[in-house]
Amino acid sequence: MSTAPPSAPTLIIVSGLSGSGKSVALKTFEDQDYYCSDNLPINLLPDFVRSLLANHDGSAPRRLAVGIDVRGQSNLSQLGNWRQLATDAGVEVEVLFFEASDEAVLKRYADTRRRHPLSQLGLSLPEAIARERELTAPLRREADAVIDTSTLNVHQLRRRIITEFALDHATRLSLLFESFAYKRGVPAEADFVFDARVLPNPHWDPDLRALSGREPGVRDYLEAQPDVQHYLAQLTDFLDTWLPKLGDGTRSYVTVAFGCTGGKHRSVFLAERMARHAREMGWEDVATYHREQD
């Protein structure tokens, strides 16, 4: 490990075998607010770091993650030298190497039907894997941590990265509470969908028809309905039970959608009410979106 001060910028170099989970690792770091770049030529590493850190106005990223693979690289053995240059520039550098058994890599390529980066050399898949192990040996020797992903699925790998590298924002889950009108379709991005059409409809009250579910008159009307109170109690219990289980680091965003006929009264009321409840329960990153109104 380098001796840079704790306040120094951080650079994570992600290397390893194709099919071992490097892309998952980079996406995990990106979700934790790292500035990420994939497939960077290794000889450009010092200039890349210097250019990013050249801004002295506070806009330069302090946490970087760079993916390196074997394509077009003839000088992987120089990683140690370029790493030292970055360290001398005041950057805290850590090299991660991801690998997996031949059997695991073969199965992953069979499942995804993607081509191995070295297949362009006319090698069979087993030959390409063996050749890549030889080419990446210098990276493996330089690694601060070697992570074998043979028995890990995507979610397990993401959780391991977050846990082992103590990422600052590991527990932050972004919650979006959205309202919509069923007549325009269910939002494709929704993780949970709740139907508010079973509740009393303020539309049939002439004094409330022109208002939205964000306004006091509609809120008072709905809160006075026993069915609404029962619905809220069950809804709150459900979300309080299951949202924390999604905040274990395997997810970054969750959208909870509420639908009614016009997307104006009941669905808006529920989205606003549950967003308020989420903030009261300690969730920090909470937003609302009213599709038919915003």
From Swiss-Prot:
InterPro entries: P-loop_NTPase, RapZ-like, RapZ-like_N, RapZ_C. ATP binds at G16, L17, S18, G19, S20, G21, K22, S23. One of its GO terms (molecular function) is GTP binding. Belongs to the RapZ-like family. Disulfide bonds: none annotated. Pfam families: PapZ_C (PF22740), RapZ-like_N (PF03668). Displays ATPase and GTPase activities. GTP binds at D69, V70, R71, G72. The lineage of its organism: Bacteria, Pseudomonadati, Pseudomonadota, Gammaproteobacteria, Lysobacterales. Keywords: ATP-binding, GTP-binding, Nucleotide-binding. This is Nucleotide-binding protein Smal_0950.
